C-alpha cells in the first residue's frame, strides 16, 4: 500500500469554537499537499486545493486563486497518487454519492482510515455555500456563518469535487464522514457542497495511513476550551442542518 500522509492545519473543533487566526500560509500548505480543502483567515471563504493550486470560493460563489501569502487557520491536504478509479454515472444526490464512496472504501477495508477522493466530470447540479471573512476572533463558526453565509447553485458544470473522509473516532480533529468542496474547470465558481447531481464523472480514491497535524503555535490558542464543541454543532456547520 502506498504510504501517504494527511497534512492538517489545526483542528475542526478549534475552528468551530472560533480559532480562525493564521497558522500557516497557502505557500507553506502547498508544500505538503496538492489536493484537499479548508478555509482562510477569519473564515474568509471556502478552500479548494486541486492539481497543486489553492482556490478561494467567495460568498457569492465566485472563485479566485489564493496567493501564497494568504493565511490558513484550518485545512487538510495530501499528495495524491495514482489510486483506485471509480466510474460514477447518474448520481442523483449527495447521499447516493456518499453511499457509493462508502462501499468503495469498505471494499478496501478502509472505513477506519482517512481518504481523499478527487472526482472530475460533468455535474448537472451543485448546491453549495461560502462565507466572507469575520475579523473578530473568539467568534464561533456557527455565528460567522449566520452573519455571512450565502447559498448558491451551479447547473450543468464541468469541474472537480474534492472529498475528504475521516473515520468516526477522529471526530473533533476533523468532521467524521465525508466533507466535499467543488471548483469548476474554468475556476470561476465553487464552494462547500451540500448536495450534488452527477451526470458522469471519474473518482480517484487515495487511502491515507498517516496524519501530521500542525497546531497553532501562539498563546492565544491555549485560551480556547476545545471540549465545548458538540457533535451536533459540528454537523450543523458542516452540513447546514
How should each PLM-predicted stretch be described?
Residues 11-77:
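N-terminal low-complexity or amphipathic/hydrophobic leaders
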Residues 57-58, 127-128, 171-172, 190-192:
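Short helix/loop capping segments that flank catalytic or ligand/cofactor-binding pockets
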Residues 57-105:
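A glycine-rich, hydrophobic loop/mini-helix early in the fold
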Residues 99-164, 171-173:
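Long, positively charged binding patches that form subdomain-scale interaction surfaces
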Residues 175-183:
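Histidine-centered divalent-metal-coordination microenvironment in nucleic-acid enzymes
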Residues 184-227:
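A hydrophobic, small-residue-rich beta->alpha segment in the mid-to-C-terminal subdomain
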Amino acid at each position: 500500500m502506498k504510504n501517504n500522509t494527511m497534512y492538517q492545519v489545526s483542528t475542526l473543533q478549534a475552528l468551530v469554537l472560533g480559532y480562525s487566526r493564521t497558522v500557516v500560509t497557502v505557500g507553506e500548505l502547498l508544500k505538503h499537499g496538492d489536493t484537499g480543502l479548508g478555509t482562510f483567515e477569519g473564515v474568509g471563504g471556502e478552500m479548494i486545493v486541486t492539481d497543486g493550486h489553492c482556490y478561494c470560493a467567495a460568498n457569492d460563489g465566485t472563485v479566485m486563486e489564493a496567493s501564497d501569502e494568504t493565511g490558513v487557520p484550518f485545512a487538510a491536504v495530501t499528495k495524491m497518487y495514482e489510486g483506485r478509479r471509480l466510474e460514477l454515472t447518474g448520481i442523483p444526490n449527495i447521499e447516493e454519492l456518499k453511499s457509493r464512496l462508502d462501499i468503495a472504501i469498505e471494499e478496501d477495508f478502509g472505513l477506519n482510515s482517512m481518504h481523499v477522493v478527487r472526482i472530475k466530470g460533468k455535474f448537472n447540479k451543485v448546491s453549495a455555500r461560502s462565507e466572507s471573512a469575520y475579523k473578530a476572533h473568539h467568534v464561533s463558526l456557527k455565528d460567522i456563518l449566520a452573519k455571512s453565509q450565502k447559498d448558491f447553485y451551479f447547473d450543468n458544470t464541468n469541474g472537480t469535487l474534492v472529498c475528504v473522509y475521516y473515520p468516526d473516532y477522529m471526530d473533533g480533529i476533523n468532521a467524521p464522514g465525508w466533507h466535499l468542496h467543488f471548483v469548476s474547470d474554468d475556476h470561476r465558481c465553487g464552494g462547500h457542497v451540500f448536495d450534488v447531481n452527477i451526470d458522469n464523472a471519474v473518482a480517484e480514491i487515495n487511502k491515507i495511513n498517516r496524519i501530521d497535524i500542525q497546531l497553532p503555535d501562539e498563546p492565544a490558542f491555549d485560551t480556547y476550551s476545545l471540549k465545548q464543541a458538540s457533535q451536533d454543532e459540528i454537523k450543523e456547520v458542516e452540513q447546514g442542518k
